[in-house]
A protein has these predicted regions:
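Amphipathic alpha-helical dimerization/coiled-coil segments
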Residues: 1-6, 23-24, 82-100
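Accessory beta->alpha helical hairpin/"wing" motif in late/C-terminal subdomains of nucleic-acid enzymes
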Residues: 77-81
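Short, hydrophobic-biased segments on the C-terminal half of alpha helices
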Residues: 51-52
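N-terminal helix-turn-helix DNA-binding core of bacterial DNA-binding proteins
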Residues: 5-46, 65-76
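Short beta-strand "wing" residues that participate in macromolecule-binding interfaces
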Residues: 62
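Glycine-centered, phosphate/nucleic-acid-interacting loop/turn motifs that mediate DNA/RNA or nucleotide
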Residues: 58
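Generic serine detector
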Residues: 48, 65, 93-96
Length: 100
């Protein structure tokens, strides 16, 4: 039996909240901040920190705008983020050729 190599897990994704963000965006393509906050049952501060980590890794793009006078923050998964998430799932499923 092959030993699972935890070093192949992408640290930018491997965290409960960051994994949840990536899984949600992989299906939805984009979401607004409050939608993610509600779906993931996260606090505003915690979600902001984890989105910044994913943004720094190049896995999500965060766009800020206004809808009338109300600020709107939209989060999109990037092509690099989609590839990284697919590779992460490959590693978890035991496929040795993780996509990068």
């Amino acid at each position: 039996m092959a030993v699972f190599d935890v070093t192949k897990l992408d640290d930018a994704i491997h965290g409960r909240l960051r994994l949840g963000i990536m899984a949600y965006l992989a299906d939805a393509e984009a979401a607004d901040f409050n939608e993610l906050k509600a779906v993931l049952e996260a606090t505003q501060g915690n979600l902001s920190i984890h989105l910044r980590k994913l943004e720094d890794a190049g896995y999500v793009e965060i766009l800020k705008s206004f809808q009338g006078r109300k600020p709107l923050t939209r989060v999109h998964i990037t092509p690099a983020g989609r590839r990284a998430f697919a590779g992460y799932l490959d590693v978890l499923s035991g496929r040795s050729e993780a996509r990068r």
